[in-house]
């Protein structure tokens, strides 16, 4: 395409939606195989396909936006709407877990001992590691905002520092969460408490890992001078996503760790 008379991006044919769908099929099938038959072959294949797809798809998007100029102001507006709708869909995704938790905890059945936490469950102390995790994520929210404001002001050094601090705090949170899982006295098999706790906090942990990956990509891009004060939607989307992850954790902490204990 040599000439166009509009500001929209006519996307070229791409194999990545197909390979992405294939990787999703392999990962979900692989999880079932791992749970039931203790075989990790399909899961590993799905993860490998997913990583390769993500890398090559992001590479294409970066090339189209940064080097080929396809992301005009109209295209960026559409991407903003898309990111907002994606975050709204994530809100409903986590709402299901909160619904399951409150449905079980507000009116505990006789099978649970008529109390919450259920008989025999020793919940984690909300004033120990969970409170530290809350502080870590709140601090990361401050540092990502600092990075964003620095970018808007054209201060590249401070932007990189703020982004590096945010990524470090995200990795630290993930390690703390992993240690908490390792030391917990209950498992995902321990009735409705174990299942709601590990599914809700586990999916949040997965979102922290995804958000950290998103921010690492932004950090590497900024090292190559991809973002300017007026053209940086990739970073803005990552910041929105990170703030969403922060807010979800606050609800998890208040509901499951503090009130639920």
From Swiss-Prot:
**Gene3D superfamilies per record:** 1.10.287.70, Cytochrome c oxidase, subunit III, four-helix bundle
Task: Identify the PROSITE patterns for this entry.
Answer: COX3 (PS50253)
Q: What is its EC number?
A: 7.1.1.9
Which regions of this chain are Mitochondrial intermembrane-facing, per the record's topological domains?
35-40, 106-128, 184-190, 257-261
* Keyword hit for Transmembrane helix: yes
Q: Name one GO cellular component term.
A: respiratory chain complex IV
The broad enzyme category this protein falls into is translocase
Gene Ontology biological-process annotations: mitochondrial electron transport, cytochrome c to oxygen; respiratory chain complex IV assembly
Family annotation (InterPro entries): Cyt_c/ubiquinol_Oxase_su3, Cyt_c_oxase_su3_dom, Cyt_c_oxidase-like_su3, Cyt_c_oxidase_su3-like_sf, Cyt_c_oxidase_su3_a-hlx
- Give any Pfam family that matches: COX3
Q: Name one GO molecular function term.
A: cytochrome-c oxidase activity
Q: Which UniProt keywords apply?
A: Membrane, Mitochondrion, Mitochondrion inner membrane, Translocase, Transmembrane, Transmembrane helix
Q: Which SUPFAM superfamilies match?
A: Cytochrome c oxidase subunit III-like (SSF81452)
Briefly, what is this protein's role?
Answer: Component of the cytochrome c oxidase, the last enzyme in the mitochondrial electron transport chain which drives oxidative phosphorylation. The respiratory chain contains 3 multisubunit complexes succinate dehydrogenase (complex II, CII), ubiquinol-cytochrome c oxidoreductase (cytochrome b-c1 complex, complex III, CIII) and cytochrome c oxidase (complex IV, CIV), that cooperate to transfer electrons derived from NADH and succinate to molecular oxygen, creating an electrochemical gradient over the inner membrane that drives transmembrane transport and the ATP synthase.
State the family named in the UniProt similarity comment for this chain. Belongs to the cytochrome c oxidase subunit 3 family.
Subunit structure of this chain's protein: Component of the cytochrome c oxidase (complex IV, CIV), a multisubunit enzyme composed of 14 subunits. The complex is composed of a catalytic core of 3 subunits MT-CO1, MT-CO2 and MT-CO3, encoded in the mitochondrial DNA, and 11 supernumerary subunits COX4I, COX5A, COX5B, COX6A, COX6B, COX6C, COX7A, COX7B, COX7C, COX8 and NDUFA4, which are encoded in the nuclear genome.
Supply the PANTHER family for this chain.
CYTOCHROME C OXIDASE SUBUNIT 3 (PTHR11403:SF7), CYTOCHROME C OXIDASE SUBUNIT III (PTHR11403)
**Protein's UniProt name:** Cytochrome c oxidase subunit 3
Native source species: Equus asinus (Donkey)
């Amino acid at each position: 395409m040599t000439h166009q008379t509009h500001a929209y991006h006519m996307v070229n044919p791409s194999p990545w939606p197909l390979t992405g769908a294939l990787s999703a099929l392999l990962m979900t099938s692989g999880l079932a195989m791992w749970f039931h038959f203790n075989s990790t072959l399909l899961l590993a294949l799905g993860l490998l396909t997913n990583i390769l797809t993500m890398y090559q798809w992001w590479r294409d998007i970066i090339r189209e936006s940064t080097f080929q100029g396809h992301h005009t102001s109209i295209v960026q507006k559409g991407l903003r709407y898309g990111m907002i709708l994606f975050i709204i869909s994530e809100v409903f995704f986590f709402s299901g877990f909160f619904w399951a938790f409150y449905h079980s905890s507000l009116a505990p059945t006789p099978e649970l001992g008529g109390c919450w936490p259920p008989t025999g469950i020793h919940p984690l102390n909300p004033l120990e590691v969970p409170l530290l995790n809350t502080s870590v994520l709140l601090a990361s929210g401050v540092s990502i905002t600092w990075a964003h404001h620095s970018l808007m002001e054209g201060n590249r050094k401070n932007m990189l520092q703020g982004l590096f601090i945010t990524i470090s705090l995200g990795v630290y949170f993930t390690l703390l969460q992993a240690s908490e899982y390792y030391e917990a006295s209950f498992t995902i098999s321990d009735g409705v408490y174990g299942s709601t706790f590990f599914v809700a906090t586990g999916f949040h942990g997965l979102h922290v890992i995804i958000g950290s990956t998103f921010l690492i990509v932004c950090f590497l891009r900024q090292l190559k001078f991809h973002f300017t004060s007026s053209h940086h939607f990739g970073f803005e989307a990552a910041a929105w996503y990170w703030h969403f992850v922060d807010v979800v954790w606050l609800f998890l902490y208040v509901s499951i760790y503090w009130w639920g204990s």
